[in-house]
A protein has these predicted regions:
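Conserved active-site tyrosine of GNAT-family acetyltransferases
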Residues: 15-20, 93, 117-120
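Vicinal oxygen chelate
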Residues: 1-4, 26-116, 127-132
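Short alpha-helical
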Residues: 13-14, 84
């Protein structure tokens, strides 16, 4: 089994720039209504909010539901094996003023920092295997 996260975004160009230029993702496929981004074993799909229905009966994503906090209750965790690479990425993010929480050693023994993407999705960038 693999995991691919799909995020609905307001501005595809802004989001692609964020994930590609800041976080180092490679654009695998790009179309008007979908972009596939890869970095290592991580696959992110970006789709425009505009392709969702405004409202719908039953469960499912709609533009109406996304008007609240994007990704509420979800933390997207990206792991780097190299602590120096984590520090360099943190400094780059800090220069661009996108940090939510600074790089620090956490009580569970791993370094990480937190940020939000242009659409408000919450990301934690960590060193090592957070699941171990």
């Amino acid at each position: 089994m693999r995991l691919r996260m799909e995020l609905f975004v307001e501005d595809m160009d802004v989001s692609v720039t964020f994930y590609r230029d800041l976080l180092g993702f490679r654009v695998e496929r790009r179309a008007d209504d979908y972009t596939s981004l890869h970095r290592g074993l991580v696959v992110l799909g970006l789709g425009p909010v505009a392709k969702l229905p405004e409202q719908a009966a039953g469960q499912g994503f709609t533009r109406h539901l996304l008007k609240g906090a994007r990704g509420a209750g979800v933390e997207i965790v990206l792991e780097l094996d190299d602590l120096d690479a984590l520090r360099a990425l943190y400094e780059d993010c800090r220069r661009r003023a996108v940090i939510s929480e600074p790089l620090q050693m956490r009580p569970w023994g791993l370094y990480d920092f937190r940020l939000t993407d242009p659409d408000g999705y919450y990301l934690r960038i960590t060193h090592g295997n957070a699941a171990a």
